[in-house]
Curated annotation (Swiss-Prot):
PROSITE patterns: GLOBIN
Record family assignment: Belongs to the globin family.
This protein's UniProt keywords: Heme, Iron, Metal-binding, Oxygen transport, Transport
Residues given in the record as heme b binding sites: H91
Classification via InterPro entries: Globin, Globin-like_OT, Globin-like_sf, Globin/Proto, Mb-like_M
Protein name in UniProt: Globin, monomeric component M-IV
Keyword Membrane: no
Cystine connections: none
Keyword Cytoplasm on entry: no
Source species of the chain: Glycera dibranchiata
Domain named Globin: residues: 2-147
Pfam families: Globin
Amino acid sequence: MGLSAAQRQVVASTWKDIAGSDNGAGVGKECFTKFLSAHHDIAAVFGFSGASDPGVADLGAKVLAQIGVAVSHLGDEGKMVAEMKAVGVRHKGYGYKHIKAEYFEPLGASLLSAMEHRIGGKMTAAAKDAWAAAYADISGALISGLQS
């Protein structure tokens, strides 16, 4: 756990392009559309009828906003972990007790694909590695909160 200084810099610099003018909402929608299209059975966990459900865009926007929070705390790993763990704990309270740890790996793949789609060539091999490491830290903290 923990990103190197170089990885933190890459994540922070690419986040500006990933977030874009919509704070990442488009990336979030694309991420969850891909994820739920590939994993139809998981849509019901979120109360969606499928990947085209209108709530998918809203969920994607919320998730990307939380990623933005995590990115803002990359220099303070303890704070980032605490923030993301708290998000996981809150989700238990929302009734999302059926979210499983194994959902996060394919979701991460969909997220990285959507990010790359948005920023194109700026998603270099180093950026992919940095974002994969950041996502591992973020999702690990979320899972910890969900399972607490």
